[in-house]
């Protein structure tokens, strides 16, 4: 063993070490192939996810939003669903980046293994030289500034982000405008109302207005419809006509749209149904609340003042949007 000739192959221990290194290289090669396969399988899925974000957003929003909702609820649900989907996309991207970093680390290890010498005692020589270099470089590192990198796995969605906040604000404004357009379409929809002109007896009629019309506008149309037949309606003003729905006197400034969107409740039935129907469920099950809708009454104010102590006028009271009626009644106060 006087030199390092090309024909020298080492001792039996060296041969064992060489075989062990070859096995390690083979095992690492298999791991790298597995990481490559995982990376290639994950990428198309991410692209596919990103391409269908708008479809997923619309589907999730339709499931969350049923019937009429207020503007604030509409905007809040839309933004919450969009934020949730964006966070899921970000998590998928971070996971893919982490797998890519692990793959690059395995490649660096593989290059270092390929550079190892075949002779065992060369390890000691190189290790010694590495230690000397490390000792020489260590004082220099202490004097230089320490640079810290970013950890891609850390959650940062809670941190302030001007660009993201600007995008969210723009999305809110867009949704508000969209909501306003949709509500205008609803207000212009026709609404058929069954009512009864009440002068002690009922005279039932049907009239059509818009959902956005106020009670005052509705009573003006009623006056025009009843004027040819009833002299007292023809000679009075719209301000002296009252609209009584489910034993509540609805003030002129309220609109049908307001009653519908808030699903307002009266003393004897819902205020957002303007047809007439009976609830057949109560025949089979008396424990269920009736959902019957009764024809609203149009009354001349002078008649009401003269008969408000007599049933049914004795049950009537002014509608208050803040007052909640927990159950429907047709008798008593």
Curated annotation (Swiss-Prot):
One of its GO terms (cellular component) is nucleus. Its main location: nucleus. Keywords: Biological rhythms, Coiled coil, Nucleus. GO terms for biological process: chromatin organization; ethylene-activated signaling pathway; miRNA processing; regulation of circadian rhythm; regulation of photomorphogenesis; response to blue light; response to red light; rhythmic process. Transmembrane segments: none annotated. Residues 123-136 have a biased composition (Acidic residues). Residues 89-171 are annotated as: Disordered. It is found in: Nucleus. Pfam families: XAP5. The keyword Nucleus applies. Residues 12-43, 70-116 form a coiled coil. InterPro entries: FAM50A/XAP5_C, XAP5. Residues 89-98, 160-171 have a biased composition (Basic and acidic residues). Belongs to the FAM50 family. PANTHER family: PROTEIN FAM50A (PTHR12722:SF0), XAP-5 PROTEIN-RELATED (PTHR12722). Involved in light regulation of the circadian clock and photomorphogenesis. This is Protein XAP5 CIRCADIAN TIMEKEEPER. It comes from Oryza sativa subsp. indica.
């Amino acid at each position: 063993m006087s030199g390092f000739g090309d024909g020298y192959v080492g001792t039996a221990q060296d041969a064992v070490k060489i075989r062990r290194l070859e096995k390690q290289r083979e095992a690492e090669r298999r791991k790298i192939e597995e990481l490559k396969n995982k990376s290639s399988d994950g990428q198309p899925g991410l692209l596919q996810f990103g391409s269908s974000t708008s479809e997923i957003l619309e589907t999730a929003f339709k499931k969350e939003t049923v019937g009429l909702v207020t503007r604030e609820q509409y905007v809040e649900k839309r933004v919450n669903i969009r934020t949730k989907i964006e966070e899921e996309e970000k998590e998928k991207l971070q996971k893919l980046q982490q797998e890519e970093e692990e793959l690059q680390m395995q490649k660096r290890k593989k290059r270092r293994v390929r550079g190892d010498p075949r002779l065992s005692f060369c390890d000691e020589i190189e290790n010694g030289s590495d230690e000397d270099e490390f000792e020489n470089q260590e004082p220099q590192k202490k004097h230089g500034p320490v640079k810290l990198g970013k950890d891609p796995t850390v959650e940062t969605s809670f941190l302030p982000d001007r660009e993201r906040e600007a995008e969210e604000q723009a999305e809110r404004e867009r949704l508000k405008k969209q909501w306003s357009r949709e509500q205008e379409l609803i207000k212009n929809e026709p609404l058929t109302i069954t009512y009864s002109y009440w002068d002690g007896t009922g005279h039932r009629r049907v009239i059509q207005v818009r959902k956005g019309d106020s009670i005052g506008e509705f009573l003006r149309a009623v006056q025009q419809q009843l004027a040819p037949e009833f002299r007292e309606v023809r000679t009075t003003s719209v301000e002296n006509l009252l609209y009584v729905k489910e034993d509540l006197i609805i003030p002129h400034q309220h609109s049908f749209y307001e009653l519908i969107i808030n699903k307002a409740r009266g003393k004897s039935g819902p205020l957002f149904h303007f047809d007439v129907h009976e609830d057949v469920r109560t025949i089979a099950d008396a424990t269920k609340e009736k959902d019957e809708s009764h024809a609203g009454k149009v009354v001349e104010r002078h008649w009401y003042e003269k008969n408000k102590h007599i049933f049914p006028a004795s049950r009537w009271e002014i509608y208050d949007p803040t007052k909640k009626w927990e159950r429907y009644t047709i008798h008593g106060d």
